[in-house]
């Protein structure tokens, strides 16, 4: 699976320089991160609703659409697939493959260390 995501990412990168008039991906990239994020949310919602309704085949199709838009979002955000895989590997080591990282741990992991710097040192650093 990671190979197909990598190929998709490479295709998105190639589409970046294509004519938006002939490339849906180029058009989406040109629209910017807000539009791409909206499409990710839309596809996720559609897939979830299809799953709730028991429409298995539609879940498969919407999942493929979701992955496509997610990869476009990664490209737009400058995120490489290998970074996502590395994060998944890190989480697997901490919590196991089928567990999601607890919300309170996410906050702890994202919170930067605050180191007080006196004003004199700050002025010298400029």
Predicted segments, located by residue:
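Flexible "arm" and connector segments at domain edges
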Residues: 1-62, 68-126
């Amino acid at each position: 699976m990671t190979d197909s995501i990598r190929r998709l990412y490479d295709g998105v990168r190639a589409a970046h320089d294509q004519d938006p008039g002939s490339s849906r991906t180029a058009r989406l990239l040109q629209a910017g991160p807000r539009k791409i994020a909206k499409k990710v949310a839309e596809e996720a919602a559609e897939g979830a609703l299809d799953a709730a309704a028991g429409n298995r085949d539609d879940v498969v199709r919407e999942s493929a659409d979701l992955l496509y838009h997610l990869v476009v979002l990664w490209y737009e955000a400058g995120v490489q697939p290998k970074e996502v895989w590395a994060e998944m590997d890190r989480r697997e080591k901490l919590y196991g493959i089928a567990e999601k990282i607890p919300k309170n741990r996410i906050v702890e992991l994202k919170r930067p260390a605050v180191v007080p710097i006196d004003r004199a040192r700050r002025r010298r650093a400029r």
